[in-house]
Amino acid sequence: LCELEQYISKLAEKSDDKKPNKRDTFRNFVLNNFDENHKLFTLTAPTGYGKTLTALNFALKFNKSRIIYALPFTSIIDQTYDIVAKIYKNSDILVSKAHHKTTIDEKNLTEEDRYSKIKFLMESFSGEINITTLYQLIFALFGNKNKDNVKFNQLKNSVVIIDEAQAIPL
């Protein structure tokens, strides 16, 4: 939580406008209305209001084992991962990304490691913050393969964020 708040503060410092902006107002409203007794939330705001970081900030307040951040498009997953990984690069928080185009840089891995730790983290939602596709989340809930069962078990004591839910094909 601390790293994220520092990142958000740095963004505000870089802004030419020193008065509270729409993002600050939106984030403060969301965070001030946090109620851990509720289990389901919706977050709706126009583009540019900082929903991604606000949702992550909100999810961190629950103090659960992990966050599963599901998005519909690989481009948004990559963009979100880049931001979140940058925020937590100097911390012990493990941020993982998994979609069908995710690759592992295997040139520095031993044969033993090639299909162990990194691949397991990518495919199992075992990081503290896991950024993935809506399809991976759906497979975790309804899949019938062993790797889906591993993901399903990781949903316990987790906060699940479904971003751009309107993009789910029904």
Residue ranges and their predicted role:
Residues 1-170:
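N-terminal helicase ATP-binding lobe
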